Regions:
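Membrane-embedded alpha-helical bundles of multi-pass transporters/translocases
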Residues: 2-212
Length: 212
């Protein structure tokens, strides 16, 4: 963490840090708006099965957050504590996005369960260290607020863009739940590696504060 509380982080650095939020929120919105009708109406899974799977995964997600947070805090590598999680978790997340958002023509509940588990786990592997990294960039309260605010801007933009995908597709004469999920999936698969790569390249990761 930066010790100088009067220091102001470069604007470019802060905006680059916020970029991954654009893709990360695009993962969450389909789970809330589009996933259930896509898998029930397009893929043919029973609504109760989809509901049970998502309920079970959400229960496990309550374990994922503190688990990955604790491991990330304690991790020590020459690349830092947060970087490895964004790299490994981001790669797994991209594979999960590909399979969950663009599945084969025929799937069963096992396929859905497996890829939902991997999707939620890998998303947590990225988002928890990512948010922690932002808080560690400075010890200044105002700067932390600025960093979080810019991250929220990207979250808001990603939310609006993702929720508006069906409308955007209609402007090009394309419609349907499959097209919507594919468009969002491709968006994440393009934006996530580029934005994470920029963060790894341009945003410093302060060393952890030694405990007394």
């Amino acid at each position: 963490m930066v010790d100088n509380e009067k220091s102001r982080l470069p604007a470019a650095q802060v905006w680059i840090y916020g970029l991954p939020a654009l893709a990360l929120t695009a993962v969450g919105i389909p789970l809330l708006l589009f996933l259930v009708p896509f898998y029930t109406e397009e893929m043919g899974l029973h609504p109760e099965v989809v509901g049970y799977v998502l309920f079970a995964v959400r229960l496990l997600d309550a374990v994922f957050d503190p688990t990955f947070g604790t491991i990330s805090d304690r991790l020590r590598t020459r690349w830092g504590r947060r970087r490895p999680w964004l790299i490994i978790g981001g790669a797994i997340l991209m594979v999960a996005i590909w399979h969950a958002f663009m599945p084969p023509e025929k799937v069963d509940w096992v396929y859905f369960l497996v890829w939902m588990l991997i999707l939620y786990a890998s998303w947590t592997m990225v988002i928890v260290p990512y948010v922690a990294w932002g808080a560690e960039l400075t010890g200044n309260f105002d700067e932390r607020t600025r960093i979080a605010g810019i991250r929220e801007v990207f979250l808001l933009v990603g939310t609006v863009l993702t929720a508006g995908v069906p409308t955007i597709l209609k402007l090009f004469g394309v419609s349907g739940q499959t097209a919507t999920m594919e468009a969002i999936g491709i968006f994440v698969l393009v934006v996530l590696p580029v934005s994470v790569g920029l963060v790894l390249w341009r945003v410093p990761e302060p060393p952890p504060i030694a405990s007394a």
